[in-house]
Curated annotation (Swiss-Prot):
Gene Ontology cellular component annotations, sorted alphabetically: plasma membrane
Name this protein carries in UniProt: Lipoprotein signal peptidase
Residues annotated as transmembrane: 61-81, 85-105, 125-145
Organism: Streptococcus thermophilus (strain ATCC BAA-250 / LMG 18311)
Membrane association type: Multi-pass membrane protein
Catalytic reaction(s) noted: Release of signal peptides from bacterial membrane prolipoproteins. Hydrolyzes -Xaa-Yaa-Zaa-|-(S,diacylglyceryl)Cys-, in which Xaa is hydrophobic (preferably Leu), and Yaa (Ala or Ser) and Zaa (Gly or Ala) have small, neutral side chains
Function: This protein specifically catalyzes the removal of signal peptides from prolipoproteins.
GO biological process entries: proteolysis
Pathway: Protein modification; lipoprotein biosynthesis (signal peptide cleavage)
EC number, UniProt record: 3.4.23.36
Primary location class: membrane
Keywords: Aspartyl protease, Cell membrane, Hydrolase, Membrane, Protease, Transmembrane, Transmembrane helix
UniProt-listed PANTHER family: LIPOPROTEIN SIGNAL PEPTIDASE (PTHR33695:SF1)
GO MF term set: aspartic-type endopeptidase activity
Length: 153
């Protein structure tokens, strides 16, 4: 992936996350549930003052510091390894974008806007940035596991 494409991808992903969050805040009342696809997923506007699954509620400064450290480490690793694997770059782009997307909410609003509720499973309500983080971390784990086991592709 060319150097210029990386920041463009990060900004585009952050933009999508922030646009969805702004749309939800403008169009859905707090705690309102809208069945988007019945039985599959709903949109539910929540203000999450903790981490994933609403743990560590009201620990804003802890999350700000943790996010800065994680984004800093991911950026450093990306700069050092951007020429290695497209999959590695993609995983880091997702982690950085998701971290920054939720960081913007936490600093600007004091909470993170969550909205995606999976109706077919008992699971926490999450947002687009959380999806980026989850996919990015899982992809990174898979890449590192494959490297550790000598399966280079």
């Amino acid at each position: 992936m060319r150097k210029v494409a990386i920041p463009v991808a990060i900004l585009a992903l952050i933009g999508l996350d922030q646009w969805v969050k702004h749309w939800v805040v403008a169009n859905i009342s707090l705690n309102q549930v809208i069945k988007a696809i019945p039985g599959v997923f709903s949109l539910t506007y929540l203000q999450n003052r903790g981490a994933a699954f609403s743990i560590l509620q009201n620990q804003k400064y802890f999350f700000v510091i943790l996010t800065v450290l994680v984004i800093g480490a991911a950026l450093f690793y990306l700069v050092k390894n951007y020429q290695k694997s497209l999959w590695l770059v993609l995983s880091l782009i997702l982690i950085i974008s998701g971290g920054i997307g939720n960081f913007i909410d936490r600093v600007h609003l004091g909470y993170v806007v969550d909205m995606v509720q999976l109706d077919f499973i008992d699971f926490a309500i999450f947002n687009v940035a959380d999806s980026y983080l989850t996919v990015g971390v899982l992809l990174l784990i898979l890449i590192l596991w494959k490297e550790e086991n000598g399966s280079h592709h």
